[in-house]
């Protein structure tokens, strides 16, 4: 039996169609897209076609005088840091939450070291940002303004948060839609977001590339100065990665409704099976946010009394790939901050692990995962 991969929130398999598009672009457009000769112009055309296609698929403005900008980066982490550090005006307040990716949290810490007032907003029990606390922060920011980070789908729990109606001109919003891009129909032009981050390795695309979308008229200080990417990100662009990015997003968009429906059904079946397996072992099972709005592909599961790291390691030895948390924080032995922010019992917090499904997850994968975890629980108890 091969491995059962249930860590799609960390990374997804590269789609064959995407690999084919990247291979072809490598063959025909190998030149530097900044070069002025014919080969360079061909590479530049493929790069710009990919940029415009991605921008169109996320609902950005691609025509007229107010075209939105899409900056290719090395990944979502760089894009998040560019947004947070580059959009923070002098004297502005910074607001983040336990929902946010570690790259946003670390950027906020850096801004605090530079003298900005930074607040970690509390969450409601459904995982959404506390609106009263946010209103207080906006009021305290006054004329200096507030830079707010939002994460529509939390990568640890799958819990959703909805877009907020905030005072125009007083709040700059950076949205990290890295988890949401494959599962939600995005309309950047109609949103209140100033900037937005996404990366294709979450939906069958390549690693090593991400994108930051920014409004046309918003000043932003580059993290890596240079002449490329509208002067907002230095370094020779990776044309094949951009082509793969666009193709992966195109496929994910076309298949979104069908895949979301099927994956949610599989996730629900998995959760029922894990609750039954826990009961058979004489344990309780908790599904974090089970009755709250959630993304279809993520389940945060807790078996109080069972160490999450031991469980994930035991499952791995049996052939099931799970996670204790977000891959970008996997070096830490501490539970995810959102679990503390939800004010859960310590026994739940320290036993929570993540199962995340994707387009390639099958009925057989779910059945086998349930049986593997049933065996792991039985051995841990007895």
Residue ranges of each PLM-predicted region?
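Pyridoxal 5′-phosphate
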Residues: 1-382
